[in-house]
Amino acid sequence: MTADIGATLNRNSWLKDSIVKIRGKQVILAGDVGGTKCNLALFSEKGGTLIPVFKQRFASKEFAQFDLIVKEFSRQAADHLGSERIIAAGFGIAGPVINGRVRATNLPWVVETETLIRELAVPNVVLLNDLGATGHSLEHLPPEDFCVLNPGVPEAGGTRALLAAGTGLGQSILVWDGGRYRVVPSEGGHSDFAPHTEQQIELLRFMRRRYPQVSWELILSGRGFRTIHEFLAPNVKHASFEDPDADPAPEITRRGLDKSCRVCADTLDLWTAIYGAEAGNLAL
């Protein structure tokens, strides 16, 4: 995803100017800021493209604020920077960005460009919605980075939709304006879940006993795996269920894919069906 942000930097006017001016002693900082992890990387310019020179991953919930991650990254990167200096930075963050400020989704963070400018001592910092950043990167990704699920012929200039389940459920739309794609960030993952089958109706009833509003994101995210598993088999527990801070999604996924647990396999099937339904909704 840091590569996505790196590609996104090329699409921003002031950063395009900055990239043109990059020399051997200048770098750009890019980051993907999520509810579970943060990926940060330094990029240098080579042949008109950005090349990662140092990258690091941090567990988001281990830090009280994002600027503390930036501070720790800067400390670790010092040896790699040498006499090089950061001249610009861009970060994709899960949440709506308003006037250079974003209250991160699924984290108790408020991130502001002014704070990061002071912390990094750089003149230019840009914050983007994370799926907006991904949208900007699509035209820069090589063919091997795509996996075709249903073969077809894309319509030239056709509207594109992005859906990404993780700690939350990110969405964005890309609209062709006649010259290039314009990215429209969306918080559609927080809209109300609409069940399609009797089983999904029962799932909604199950979740309404826990939440006043059941959104697509509550299901189509990492926590949704555990919720669906508990709905299908409330008395079946796995080792990762015992630790309140653990994420059982990887274990459920692994055991569902290798068919070592029938409930896990059923959980994957139901989760995937709902994911497909929401992808169809977004396409409409």
Residue ranges, per PLM feature:
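ATP-binding/phosphotransfer module of carbohydrate and carboxylate kinases, centering on a glycine-rich
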Residues: 2-85, 202-284
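Active-site flanking residues adjacent to catalytic metal/cofactor-binding acidic residues
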Residues: 31, 129, 165
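Glycine-rich phosphate-binding loop plus the immediately following alpha-helix
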Residues: 131, 161, 167-237
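A glycine- and small-aliphatic-rich helix-loop capping segment at beta-alpha/alpha-beta transitions
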Residues: 45-49, 105-110, 141-149, 176-184
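Generic detection of short hydrophobic beta-strand segments and adjacent strand-loop junctions
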Residues: 56-58, 148, 191
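Gly/Ser/Thr-rich beta-alpha loop segments that engage phosphate groups in nucleotides
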Residues: 36-37, 92-97, 168-172, 191
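Short beta-strand-loop/turn "lid" adjacent to the catalytic site in phosphate-handling enzymes
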Residues: 79-127, 132-145, 162
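Conserved phosphate-binding catalytic cores of ATP/NTP-utilizing and phosphoryl-transfer enzymes
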Residues: 8-23, 126-160
